[in-house]
């Protein structure tokens, strides 16, 4: 058995068929989600030697001209639940603080931030948190996302209560932090339906924008053919787009804790049920629709809990 050089070096090793790039993963192997480098981005600078698996000739020939080859497997790091919950708490706190601060600043300073600025602030916060904490907790930041992924077997149900609990706690802490910084202008950050729309319109607006968000998240987070390295940018762009459209009417929540934390701090619970139920239903629908329409793996692989954000 000979191990292929990572960048196609060595005549006897397995080399990539295109431009000397490192070999792809075994067919059907789930791509890392918001959790670090892919298996084909291996370098000599890694601190530990990855595991090497020999393939029979019939399989190896599909990947390399040699009769036998080795495929590098990098196992997902073992992160304790405590660390995951800590990262999820911090990520949710940061998201709620900055996504809510933008409309509060707008209220306090008479439109200092444009509607696009409000949307971009939330989108950039999401991108930043995914890139900084995704490799630890998966950067769910949203109970609707956690529940939807669990329903589709991309995340273990046993961890759902703990994730939702720290998301709620992070949201409430962010709400009171905002109250301390911006009092008495906190009402500008609470998402409530605009008086010009009906309850049904508000409900379906939140349903649709959350559907769109989870359709994108499920694509970049569970499909092996998606460009996982761009997950943070894609999800942040989806959040920005949704808030640009729904911000003037419902606030563009897409997230029960985006509404809950500021509502608790401000004591404003008007139509709160819309922001708890509509995003959750929209999330399950969006994730489910992408799962139904995506291309299937050739080996017919079924979803596994490890596919959800590699946690």
From Swiss-Prot:
Low complexity: compositionally biased ranges: 20-34
Segments for region (Disordered): 1-34
Domain notes from UniProt: Aquaporins contain two tandem repeats each containing three membrane-spanning domains and a pore-forming loop with the signature motif Asn-Pro-Ala (NPA).
GO molecular function: channel activity
GO cellular component, one term: membrane
Protein name as it appears in the record: Aquaporin NIP3-1
Location(s), subcellular: Membrane
Coiled coil: none
Alphabetical list of InterPro entries matching this protein: Aquaporin-like, Aquaporin_transptr, MIP, MIP_CS
Family: Belongs to the MIP/aquaporin (TC 1.A.8) family. NIP (TC 1.A.8.12) subfamily.
Parts of the chain that traverse the membrane: 85-105, 111-131, 158-178, 202-222, 226-246, 273-293
Main localization, broad class: membrane
Entry-linked Gene3D superfamilies: Glycerol uptake facilitator protein (1.20.1080.10)
Keyword annotations: Membrane, Repeat, Transmembrane, Transmembrane helix, Transport
Locus of motif NPA 2: 255-257
């Amino acid at each position: 058995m000979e191990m292929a050089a990572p960048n196609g070096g060595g005549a006897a090793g397995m080399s990539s068929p295109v431009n000397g790039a490192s070999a792809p993963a075994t067919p059907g192997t789930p791509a890392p989600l918001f959790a670090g480098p892919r298996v084909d981005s291996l370098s000599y600078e890694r601190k530990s030697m990855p595991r090497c698996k020999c393939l029979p000739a019939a399989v190896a020939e599909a990947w390399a001209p040699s009769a036998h080859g080795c495929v590098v497997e990098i196992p997902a790091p073992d992160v304790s639940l405590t660390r995951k919950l800590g990262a999820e708490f911090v990520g949710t706190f940061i998201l709620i603080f900055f996504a809510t601060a933008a409309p509060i600043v707008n209220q306090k300073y008479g439109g200092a931030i444009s509607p696009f600025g409000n949307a971009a602030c939330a989108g950039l916060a999401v991108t930043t948190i995914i890139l900084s904490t995704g490799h630890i907790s998966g950067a769910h930041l949203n109970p609707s996302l956690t529940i939807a992924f669990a329903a589709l077997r991309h995340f273990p149900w046993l961890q759902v209560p703990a994730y939702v609990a720290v998301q709620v706690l992070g949201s409430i802490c962010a709400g009171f932090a905002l109250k301390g910084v911006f009092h008495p202008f906190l009402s500008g950050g609470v998402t409530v339906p605009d008086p010009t729309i009906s309850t049904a319109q508000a409900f379906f607006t939140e349903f649709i924008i959350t559907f769109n968000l989870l359709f994108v998240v499920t694509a970049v987070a569970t499909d092996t053919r998606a460009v996982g390295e761009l997950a943070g940018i894609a999800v942040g762009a989806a959040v920005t787009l949704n808030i640009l459209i729904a911000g003037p009417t419902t606030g563009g929540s897409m997230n029960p804790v985006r509404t809950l934390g500021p509502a608790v701090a401000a004591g404003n619970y008007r139509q709160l049920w819309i922001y708890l139920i509509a995003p959750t239903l929209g999330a399950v629908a969006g994730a489910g629709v992408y799962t139904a329409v995506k291309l299937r793996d050739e080996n017919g692989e079924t979803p596994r809990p490890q596919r959800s954000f590699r946690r």
